[in-house]
A protein has these predicted regions:
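Short, small-residue-enriched loops and turns at beta-alpha junctions
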Residues: 2-5, 16-17, 64-66, 91-92, ...
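Hydrophobic faces of well-ordered beta-strands that scaffold small-molecule active sites
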Residues: 17-19, 37-40, 58-60, 82-87, ...
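Catalytic cores of alpha/beta
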Residues: 2-12, 45-53, 70, 83, ...
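Glycine-rich phosphate-binding active-site loops on the catalytic face of alpha/beta enzymes
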Residues: 21-26, 60-68, 100-125
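N-terminal/domain-start segments enriched in small and hydrophobic, helix-friendly residues
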Residues: 41-58, 64
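Glycine/small-residue-rich loop that forms an oxyanion/phosphate-binding "nest" at active or ligand-binding sites
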Residues: 1-44
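C-terminal helical cap(s) of enzyme catalytic domains, especially alpha/beta-barrels
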Residues: 30-35, 98, 113-137
């Protein structure tokens, strides 16, 4: 992903740029375009860089591989930020992630793994789980 991708995204109507990595070029282009920047982070160095470059939300990826305990370890030195979990987040784990400080989720496989007709129901299941978890926190 690069500056041209950001520009093309804006032309196509994007409001948010979610990137797989932390890139000063991409974050700067995103901010200059007036869009929300959500870079992928997995290490303290990537987190510090993303924040220094102006990221709005930190995309913790791959969430299921790194795990909740790792998130807590890298999140604590960087308080006051908004986090999104992506990569293998299961419906059954939503409450654990929300309690660990995750504000939102990027979902692919958990929504599309069944038939197309089931996608709306899975979206509702995730919405319900997120709201219940936030209300019980």
């Amino acid at each position: 992903m690069n500056k041209l991708d950001v520009e093309n995204g804006k032309k196509a109507g994007a409001k948010i740029v979610i990137s797989p990595h932390t890139s000063e070029e991409v974050i700067n282009a995103t901010k200059n375009a007036g869009l929300v920047s959500v870079p992928g982070v997995a290490t303290p160095t990537e987190i510090a860089d993303a924040l220094r470059y102006g990221a709005d939300i930190l995309k913790f990826f791959p969430a299921s591989s790194l795990g909740v305990n790792f998130l807590k370890s890298v999140r604590d030195p960087f308080p006051g930020n908004t986090w999104m979990a992506t990569g293998g987040v299961a419906l059954a784990d939503v409450d654990t992630w929300v309690k660990a400080g995750i504000s939102g989720f990027g979902l692919g496989g958990p929504l599309t793994s069944g038939g197309v007709s089931d996608i709306a129901n899975r979206v509702k299941d995730f919405q319900r789980a997120i709201l219940e978890s936030k209300n019980n926190s």
